[in-house]
C-alpha cells in the first residue's frame, strides 16, 4: 500500500467517525423524542414554566401518572428531559451506575458556595470518605441515645402551645411551630446547640439566616444559573468583594446569610472542640451532653485512621448542610401530617388512642415507639403520597443505555425495552411518580390511607422493589447519595406526634390551603400569598379520667 494515501485514509476514517458520532447522537435524541409526554407549552421554554411554576402541582401530577413510568417533557428550545419512575431504570441511575449519572454542575457549585465542602457539595472519593465516617454516626444505636433530647424539646413545645390554647381553641400557624421544632431538634440532636427557648416568639441569628435562605435564593433564581461559570473566578477575596459590592440587594443578602451561617457554624465547632479536648466532664455540660451528631462525628474523626480522617473544613461544612437538609423537609412533612389528621378526624382519634394506650407522651424507648403500628402507618403514608421533594435531577456524563423493567410504547408505536440516553440529558428522578403508581400500589394509590401499612403490602410492590432506602418509597432517594438523616427524621416525626396528639386536637379552619411547588413543597393560605403557613384550629384534648 502506498504511504501517499495515508492522509486521505485518515481523513476518510475521521469523517466516518464524526458521521457515526452524529448519527448516534441524532438517533438517541430521536429516541428521546419518541418517549410519550405532554406537548411543549412554548417553543422557547418548552414545559419548564409549567413544571417549575409555584402552582405546577397539577402539571407535575399529570406527567408523573398519565404517561407511564418513563415520560418526556421539553426544556429550553425543546430539548428533551426524561422523567423516570421505572424501578429498574431507577436502580441503574442511583445505584448500579451511580458514577455515570451525576448531580448537575449547578447543584454542586451552589451547595459548595452555600455550605462549603459538606455531603451535598462533594462527589466521588471525597463524598465516599465523608459517608464512610458519617453513616455510623446516623445509626440506630446513636438514634436510641438521642430520643431523650427529642422528648425534652417536645415537652417545651407542648408547654408553649398549651399556654396559647388554655382559654379555648385557637387558630395557630402549625407550620411555624413545626419549623421551630424541627430547627431545635436538629440544633440539639445534630449540633448540640440550642437555637430557640421555644417560649417567646423570638429567634436567633443562625435560625433567622436559615429561615431567609430559601426565599432569598428563590428571588435570585435566574442569576443562580450563572454560578457554575463564575464560582471559581479569581481568588476567594476577589469573589467576596464582588458579592459585597454587587448592585442587586438580594445577592448581597445571600452573601450576608452565608457569612452568618459560616460564622455561627465555626463558633459552635470551636466550642465543641474545646469541650472535647477538656474531656467528658466538659462535654457533659454542653447542650446534647455529647450525644449529638456533631460531637459523635468529631470524636469518630479524631479516632479514625489518617486515611479515613476528613479535614476540619469538611467537618464544619456538615453543620450548615445538616441544618439545611433537616429543617424544611421535616417541618413541611409534619405540617402535612397534621393537615391530613385534621381532614381525617377518625384517624386522628384512633392514632391518639394508640399513643395514649402506649403512654408515649412522656417518654418511650426507641424500639417501642418505632413499633406503634398506626403511628408508623401515618408517617409512611404521608411520605408516600406527599413527598416533600417531588423530583431531583441527574445527568449522565457519557452516552449510555438505560434498561427498563417494562417496555415503553413510543409515540410512533415502537416498543422500547431500553433507552439510549445521550450525555448531558437532564433526567428527573420521579419520586412522586414512583411512590404513587397505580400499577404498584393499586387503584386507590393516590389516596391517603395509613391503614394500607397495617397489612402486608401488595405483591406488585414487594416483588418489583424500587431502590429507595425507606419502605419501598423513593422519598429519601437511593444509593450513595440517599438521605443520611431519614431515621433521624422518622423519629422526630414520631416524637412530635406522640406528644402533640396526647395533648391537642387539630381541626381545619375555613381558610383554603394551597401546597406550592418549590425545592421542598410548602403550604400557603390561597394561591397568591407569599407567606408559608398552615393555620389549624388547635384545642386542648381532655384526657378521659380514670374511674
Ligand atoms: C422528611 C424529611 C426529609 C426528606 C424528605 C429528605 C429527603 C432527602 C433527599 C430526597 C435527599 C437526596 C438529595 C439528592 O440526591 O440531591 C436527601 C439528602 C440528604 N439529607 Fe435528607 N431528607 C429529610 C430529612 C433529613 C434530616 C432530618 C437530615 C439530617 C439530620 C437530612 C440530611 C440529609 C443529608 C446530609 C443529605 C445529603 C446526603 C448525601 O449527599 O450523601 N435529611 N434528603
Swiss-Prot record:
Cofactor: heme
Membrane-crossing residue ranges in chain numbering: 6-23, 106-124
Pathways involved: Secondary metabolite biosynthesis
Glycosylation sites: 503, 516
A single Gene Ontology CC term: membrane
Lineage top rank: taxon: Eukaryota
Chief place where the protein resides: membrane
Pfam families per the UniProt record, alphabetical: p450 (PF00067)
EC number(s) given by UniProt: 1.-.-.-
Primary enzyme class: oxidoreductase
Keyword tags: Glycoprotein, Heme, Iron, Membrane, Metal-binding, Monooxygenase, Oxidoreductase, Transmembrane, Transmembrane helix
Gene Ontology molecular function, alphabetical: heme binding; iron ion binding; monooxygenase activity; oxidoreductase activity, acting on paired donors, with incorporation or reduction of molecular oxygen
Membrane topology: Multi-pass membrane protein
Subcellular location, record wording: Membrane
Xref: CDD domains: CYP_FUM15-like (cd11069)
Binding of heme, residues: 483
Entry function: Cytochrome P450 monooxygenase that is able to use dehydroabietic acid as a substrate for oxidation.
Family: Belongs to the cytochrome P450 family.
Matches recorded under PANTHER family: CYTOCHROME P450 (PTHR24305), CYTOCHROME P450 12A4, MITOCHONDRIAL-RELATED (PTHR24305:SF166)
Identification of the protein by name: Cytochrome P450 monooxygenase 81
Lineage of the organism: Eukaryota, Fungi, Dikarya, Basidiomycota, Agaricomycotina
